Amino acid sequence: MRLLLTFLVLMALPILPAHARTIVDSAGRTVEIPEDVNTVFAAGPPASILVYIMKPEALTGWPRALRPEERDYIAAPYRDLPETGRLTGRGGEANLERVLEIQPDLIIDFGSVRDTYIDLANRVQEQTGIPYILIDGRFENTPEALRILGEALGVPERGEELAADVKATFARIDAILENVPEEERPRVYLARGPEGLETGMKGSINTEIIERAGGRNVADDGGATRGLVQASMEQVIVANPDTIVNWDPNFYDKVFDDPLWQGTDAVQTGRVYLSPTAPFGWIDRPPSLNRMMGLIWMAGLLYPEQWQGDLRDDTRAFYKLYYQVDLTDDELERLLEWAEGRPPL
């Protein structure tokens, strides 16, 4: 196996492009990339969505093959791209042999730019000879992430178009929140999984959408804990959210009849909402550009009078601009059944 990897690396090195340019990624790394980037290996699911939205013809494959219920919401030419595995995150199963077999012009990761990911990018780039850039996946950085990727992939106009759309959505929400004091904003709990007891602490990448939409994440210990945690039922009852968002139909099906969950304001007032998940989750799963659709949805949930949006129109427009699909009426209705608490079977 070691000999095979060495052979593949040696085979890869001579075909690096003669004409190259440099780009500074979100980690401050100066990376030499080809003048024309035609193929990209996505290091994980967030990166695959980002690349697909920006320049779908460059994506060499999905880290996980699309499921049947997701396919209608991706443009037809890209539904059958091969499964490539992933280089980063939980369950990373792609290996360097696979990357070298694909021979992409560029590797992209979208998410954290902490030292762990910088070290991985440097190591993979050194071992394969393939340039590897890191793009900051924090929600607030989304416009800049789009600009960086648009420039890297040779489609700066597309990057600017999407960045402007994101900034407009952020500005629309900010205008609403200017008139809503922090203490009057909805208390929101993200209920992950079939039991609803996995959640994301305030400030985590999994719950940025709550805070950006103007909700107060009740999973807040003052910043002592970040990321996903397992909550107890007692903690949820004490936090007493007035709004619960979830993407698991198993949880949604039973929460209103569960005597423990009935102790929360959210269940008592019927403010438990099920997020659509096709082709990607609206809340996270993964935390990428798909969250922009969830942000629009959640702003409408939390501030329906001020937002004054039409979810059907907003969804159709988003899927056209970002996922490059024209939804039929049937596809739109099937998608929004989730948001109405009726996940399609």
Question: Which functions belong to the PLM regions below?
Answer:
Residues L3-P14:
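Sec-dependent N-terminal signal peptides
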Residues F41-A43, T60-P63, L106-F110, Y132-I135, ...:
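Structural recognition of the beta-strand scaffold that forms the well-ordered cores
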